[in-house]
């Protein structure tokens, strides 16, 4: 489909669309462009970040143990602990599935499935191919533009909440250091946690700096690991949707007047070959994210309820800082699941339209072999592609609505327990 020069330009253009995600992935130890041994040196940084974050779990546990009866105080502690534990799970999954993720991302960036499509080679002498190519390029460009928008919105949401946590703790500690006597104040860490042995050390070196390092590592991977991992999902999911839409556009022209009747069977076979490639790619994407996203969906059920509860507490105490922080947290955490469910719904819908595309061609006036291929494809496309969350649910808008309702019930439960 593409000449070598066009393929190189396409690869550069797609890289520019996701360059923020790729550059950010380096900072959490993921090299999405080089799976070789040299490119895997960054794995050491992944291990350092994950071990440091696991060490900070001690501070969260101590916070929970001391204030176990103060639900408003431990709610945020529990939520952030669950968040960085999920991020650690994603980081370690990246370590073991690095080659698989790299290959999928490479296929997407290079439009490998479109380049392998026999239609553009065997039917290159037909005038309809130029029209199809323009439609396919327009479709793929539209979905890659959508990919960039989603990644940037997600990135800015995570930057806002992580920056708020860090700057708020840093500024408050400096203010207390210069305005209050030594030993008369408690330090505030980026994430709510407690280290009893160093509780009265204040800002002394190295006690304060060790605590800040551990909690900053946890805070950083909460936001940036999410953007890196979920950003890959956005790229692969929307690229798959673009491939399905492009396949539909190819199939729709199977009985066009621009395709000679004696070549329509061969044309349809090329579409069937492309369908099989798209089906294999969609299955690989589903298998790659199927189980690891289950922890994220479970976490979001609790964290949405916790965030709503913290917002209600901040509203009752007239705490604007808590309200702003929880609002930003809810936006980032909510957008994370919206990305999965909304794109998963687009994925499933595009898959269902493939069968309709085969049925809508004017097959009733074609040869017996052509009609036989159409019947075969109607049977094969009867079961569409979808993105699953383990074995329990599907990434779709109904799943999103069910999660919102469940989180609301969890929020009401927390309020009732807090009032007793």
Curated annotation (Swiss-Prot):
GO CC, alphabetical: cation channel complex; dendrite membrane; plasma membrane
Positions bearing carbohydrate: 318
Extracellular side: 65-76, 172-217, 318-320, 409-420
Chain ranges on the Cytoplasmic side, renumbered to this chain: 1-43, 98-150, 239-296, 342-387
Gene Ontology molecular function, alphabetical: ionotropic olfactory receptor activity; odorant binding; olfactory receptor activity
Superkingdom in the source lineage: Eukaryota
Membrane protein topology class: Multi-pass membrane protein
Record bears the keyword Manganese: no
Compartments, record wording: Cell membrane
Main location per the UniProt record: membrane
A single BP term in Gene Ontology: signal transduction
Alphabetized UniProt keyword annotations: Cell membrane, Glycoprotein, Membrane, Olfaction, Receptor, Sensory transduction, Transducer, Transmembrane, Transmembrane helix
Transmembrane regions: 44-64, 77-97, 151-171, 218-238, 297-317, 321-341, 388-408
Quaternary structure annotation from Swiss-Prot or TrEMBL: Interacts with Orco. Complexes exist early in the endomembrane system in olfactory sensory neurons (OSNs), coupling these complexes to the conserved ciliary trafficking pathway.
Miscellaneous note of the record: The atypical heteromeric and topological design of the odorant receptors appears to be an insect-specific solution for odor recognition, making the OR/Orco complex an attractive target for the development of highly selective insect repellents to disrupt olfactory-mediated host-seeking behaviors of insect disease vectors. Odor-evoked OR currents are independent of known G-protein-coupled second messenger pathways.
Function text: Odorant receptor which mediates acceptance or avoidance behavior, depending on its substrates. The odorant receptor repertoire encodes a large collection of odor stimuli that vary widely in identity, intensity, and duration. May form a complex with Orco to form odorant-sensing units, providing sensitive and prolonged odorant signaling and calcium permeability. Involved in the behavioral responses to butyl acetate, isoamyl acetate, and hexanoic acid.
Family: Belongs to the insect chemoreceptor superfamily. Heteromeric odorant receptor channel (TC 1.A.69) family. Or63a subfamily.
Name this polypeptide is given: Odorant receptor 63a
Species whose genome carries this gene: Drosophila melanogaster (Fruit fly)
């Amino acid at each position: 489909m593409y000449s070598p020069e066009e393929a190189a330009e396409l690869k550069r253009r797609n890289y520019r669309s996701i360059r923020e995600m790729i550059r950010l992935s380096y900072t959490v130890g993921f090299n999405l462009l080089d799976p070789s041994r040299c490119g895997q040196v960054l794995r050491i940084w992944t291990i350092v970040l994950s071990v440091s974050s696991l060490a900070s779990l001690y501070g969260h546990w101590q916070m929970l143990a001391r204030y176990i009866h103060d639900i408003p105080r431990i709610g945020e502690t529990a939520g952030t602990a669950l968040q960085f534990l999920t991020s650690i799970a994603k980081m370690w999954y990246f370590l073991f599935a690095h080659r698989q993720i790299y290959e999928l991302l490479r296929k997407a960036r290079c439009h490998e499935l479109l380049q392998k499509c026999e239609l553009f080679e065997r039917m290159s002498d037909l005038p309809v191919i130029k029209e199809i190519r323009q439609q396919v390029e327009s479709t793929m460009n539209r979905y890659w533009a959508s990919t960039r928008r989603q990644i940037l919105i997600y990135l800015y949401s995570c930057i806002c909440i992580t920056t708020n946590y860090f700057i708020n703790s840093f500024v408050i500690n400096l203010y207390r250091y210069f305005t209050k006597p030594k030993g008369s104040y408690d330090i505030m860490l980026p994430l709510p946690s407690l280290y009893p042995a160093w509780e009265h050390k204040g800002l002394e070196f190295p006690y304060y700096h060790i605590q800040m390092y551990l909690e900053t590592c946890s805070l950083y991977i909460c936001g940036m690991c999410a953007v890196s991992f979920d950003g890959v999902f956005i790229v692969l999911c929307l690229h798959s949707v673009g491939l399905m839409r492009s396949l539909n556009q190819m199939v729709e022209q199977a009985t066009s007047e621009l395709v000679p009747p004696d070549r329509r069977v061969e044309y349809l076979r090329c579409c069937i070959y492309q369908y099989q490639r798209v089906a294999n790619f969609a299955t690989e994407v589903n298998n790659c994210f199927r189980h690891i996203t289950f922890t994220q969906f479970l976490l979001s059920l609790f964290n949405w309820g916790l965030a709503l509860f913290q917002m209600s507490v901040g509203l009752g105490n007239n705490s604007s800082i808590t309200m702003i922080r929880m609002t930003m947290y809810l936006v980032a955490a909510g957008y994370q699941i919206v990305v999965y469910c909304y794109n998963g719904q687009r994925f499933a819908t595009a898959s269902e339209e493939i069968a309709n595309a085969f049925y809508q061609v004017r097959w009733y006036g074609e040869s017996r072999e052509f009609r036989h291929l159409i019947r075969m494809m109607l049977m094969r496309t009867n079961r569409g592609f979808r993105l699953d969350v383990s074995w329990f649910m599907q990434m779709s808008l109904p799943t999103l609505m069910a999660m919102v309702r469940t989180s609301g019930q969890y929020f009401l439960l927390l309020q009732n327990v807090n009032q007793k």
